[in-house]
Amino acid sequence: MKKLLFCLLLLGAMPVGAQEDKDHNLNVAKNLDVMNVIYKYLDMMYVDTLDANEVVGNAIRSMLKSLDPYTVYYSESDVNELRTMITGKYVGVGMLIRWNFQLRNAVVDEPYENTPSAEAGLKKGDVIVSIDGEPMKGKDTKYVSERLRGDAGSTFELVVRRPSTGKQMKFKITRRSIYQTPAVPYYGIQEGGIGYINLSGFVENSAKAVRRAYVEMRRKGIRGLIVDLRNNGGGSEQEAADIVNMFVPKGRLVVSNRGKLKRANHDYITGMEPIDTVMPLVVLVNGNTASASEIMSGALQDFDRGVILGTRTYGKGIAQMTLDLPYNGQLKLTTNKWYTPSGRCIQAITYKHARGGSTVQKSDSTAKVFLTAHGREFKDVGGIVPDIEVKADSLPNIAYYLAAAVDSNEVLHNYEVDYIARHPTIAPAGEFSLSDTDYEEFKQRVMASGFKYDRESEKYLENLKELAKFEGYYDEARSEFEALENKLKHNVAKDLDYNKRVIKHMIENDIVAAYYYQKGSIENSLRDDKQVAEALKLLNDEAKYREILRPKKK
């Protein structure tokens, strides 16, 4: 009895944390044993022979999927995908391909500048017939992309059919290591002497590319700078810190990482003298601005070094590291949260890992208040909230269908390919526009093609009719429903006229890309960009710019 009492007292004296660790380790060991035994039984007794790579790989991926979208297992065959994500580089030919619904075939959509595809002479619309003798008819874009990639220095034969002539053309192309997208696909001086830099991602040497662009434009006398981080999904924290370092003094904390293990804790501090601490700066952001882009915009906001303009960012405030696995696999693992200089964690979603898993969106009502260097107040509401909110124009439904984002008769693609074939040259990227005659020709082709699309208003009306029937009001309101239905019927010609400005600019951007590549397309798009226009307006109003960066009087 005394021995039992002593054991109970000893157990009671054990630190709670130690007991929890012991229970946790026991649960881990038990579940690993169960998993191991289950697979042994499957391998030994299941009616069919199993592919261990597929079955175990699916089990691992399902387990990680229950945690968060960023913790991912890469088998040996998938490691190149991870490497491309980190470096921005891959070995291939450098072009965007897309699925043509009409031809049921992959086609060239956009060769990238200074890559093997552009140097070989491939054009938008070229139909990919075969790769090294293997027919590509009916093969999806993933399959075709995998065959376009390979080892650096390897040569292959590509056969395409050019729509303008109907003839097949053979190309011998040598693969090489190239950037998936340039870090800075476009920069240039805009109206009023304002510099503009489009930053597509934070990959190797992104900071150097931004520095080169900025220094060149500053030599030409710019009076302000716009850095465009819209649709920038992030990348390297170090590259983000290095870009911030261009505009803030040495020795400033840009971002701090905190995790379960000490090895996950890391602070990024500006380590060099800046190149400019006074140039007025506007950073453009939107809902697809994420991760390292939010580190950069959050730091500049906390230092009151620039004005953030656009819409609230994505809210990815967690970071990952990569770990080597047996047999040349790798694990990208979420290990920490990161915090802006003022201490904000901008993670928008909390991932729950118990009771089946769920996600919780951060609530504005429970958010804490943080202060910038000048004393401006911001809350950790999830994402970076812009200093000035400016919403971009939304894409109308008809434009979405014309762009072949869903099943399409390819009338837009065919028009663009024909236009390019008829015009060996066009006006400079920043000046090119379709004439009213050109747009009318496009409109007539759409009408003649039998183009159809779903209008959201018709969908909502159908849903409302079903609800009215369910609640017993439909018969009473039948005539009103029928009248509204007649008014909402498809009128493609009317919709093409009503949305002419948006559709026309969409076509212009596509056509310009065929002549001046991605940088030309971006330059062309800036003419009709509401958020860029607001940024230019702000940078030409010094008093308002300074006022925004001062704290509000209470």
What kind of feature is each model-predicted range?
Residues V28, M44-D51, S66-Y73, Q102-A106, ...:
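Short, solvent-exposed loop/turn elements at domain surfaces
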Residues C345-K554:
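Conserved functional hotspot residues or short segments at active or partner-binding sites
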